Amino acid sequence: MKYSDLRDFIAQLESRELLKRIDYPVSPHLEMTVVSDKVLRSGGPALLFTNTPNYNMPVLTNLFGTVERVALGMGEESIVALREIGKLLAALKEPDPPKGFKDAFSKLPLLKQALNMAPKYVSGAECQTHVWEKDEVDLTLLPIQTCWPGDVAPLITWGLVTTRGPHQSRENMGIYRQQLLSKNKLIMRWLSHRGGALDYQAWQQEYPQERFPVAVTLGADPATILAAVTPVPDTLSEYAFAGLLRGQRTRLTRCIGNDLHVPASAEIVLEGYLEPGNEAPEGPYGDHTGYYNEVQSFPVFTVERITHRDKPIYHSTYTGRPPDEPAILGVALNEVFIPLLQKQFPEIVDFYLPPEGCSYRLAVVTIKKQYPGHAKRIMMAVWSFLRQFMYTKFVIVCDDDVDARNWQDVIWAMTTRMDPSRDTVMVENTPIDYLDFASPVSGLGSKMGMDATSKWPGETQREWGKPITMDEDVLNRVNGYWSLLGLK
């Protein structure tokens, strides 16, 4: 599905009955979470709340509440096609050297397509139709959700944050939640390894007393949002990748008050800065783990300016115990990850991040095992290959006769092919999600790899068990007269 901006995407979803307008008054304080959660768990449509009490702005939730809608946002019609996007990223990330002139010529369209999707810079953008400055700036006029009863304050959840480090031409995009502090202040919660935090750290080293420019987009088009959460190669900007997904170049415009660029079709843009040394305690908030996170200090984002379109739409979500919207995104992006992994490790048959594992904390990998110790190599590969797997605590490796997406298969393999001492790998003092309160130190913890593959000579001194299977001829004969037995 091709679309020009968020509003076009909404219109097309509505025409397919994949989006529902809610005209009944629903409050962004807790009530929208209840409605959105019930609809998401039933596989229902995206929701546009048009009657938000005390606010003059509609709220969009559950935009990516099904895998189908994630695929549509990536310009595809089904989750199966997301593997092709993964293959595209794999080709751009690790291009194979051409085998000859004909092969080199065949690769040109892909490279040319990527190069031709560089952003298009425009002026007079629709996202700057209205401008609030100085005393006009009032974040409390936005229908920012309070998602859970124990949340300390309203929370921006779909803020697309643009930053740029010193001496860098490329801008970084990331999605970081932001706690409302006052009419013009938010808390920018980003983890230390994320692009925005790294840009800010580099800025403070270069300009220790100067303000760090930041722009936050609320209501970007789906391709731009999804590009920000996809493992785009460093050689390709997120905006260029968004253009590839959308089938047309991303239109960007320069912020009014700094040199950063934002999507021209964005619904709302917040312009401002971080002041070195200015931090505030953030949280607690209900999170994608299903728990409230602990309170930690993060930089304060001072908003100098708010720009927006005519009749802007506020894009929001909630996070909680899976399934939630991030979990659905994780299931879809799982299909993108597989070709990236297989490009480097072709012995991988399947890779699965179960949503109940908080989308990234546990991975199941099936392989065509080729030598003793092979499973341990794959564990290390998962932990080190993509930044997205830095916080994966558990990796279970199985043979290719196991369905990675079937817990009955996986548990059978673990309980019959594993010796806890021999087949468990523990790695200590590794990076761990700050939200993982189970780790002994904030941001630092251990990882466990489990080898649930059949063991080869050299890995065991015992004769290995042979799986029980029925004779094919007997199966076919019984299936032939099954209908005559009076059984279902």
From Swiss-Prot:
Main location, first listed in the record: membrane
Binding-site list for prenylated FMN: 175-177, 189-191, 194-195
NCBIfam families: PRK10922.1 (NF008175), UbiD family decarboxylase (TIGR00148)
An MF annotation (GO) of this entry: 3-octaprenyl-4-hydroxybenzoate carboxy-lyase activity
UniProt function note: Catalyzes the decarboxylation of 3-octaprenyl-4-hydroxy benzoate to 2-octaprenylphenol, an intermediate step in ubiquinone biosynthesis.
Residues binding Mn(2+): 172, 238
Subcellular location: Cell membrane
Recorded metabolic or biological pathway in which this protein acts: Cofactor biosynthesis; ubiquinone biosynthesis
Cofactor or coenzyme needed: prenylated FMN; Mn(2+)
GO CC list: cytosol; plasma membrane
EC number: 4.1.1.98
Cysteine pairings via disulfide bonds: none
Domain of life, per lineage: Bacteria
UniProt record, GO biological process: ubiquinone biosynthetic process
Family: Belongs to the UbiD family.
Species assigned in the record: Legionella pneumophila (strain Corby)
Designated name of the protein: 3-octaprenyl-4-hydroxybenzoate carboxy-lyase
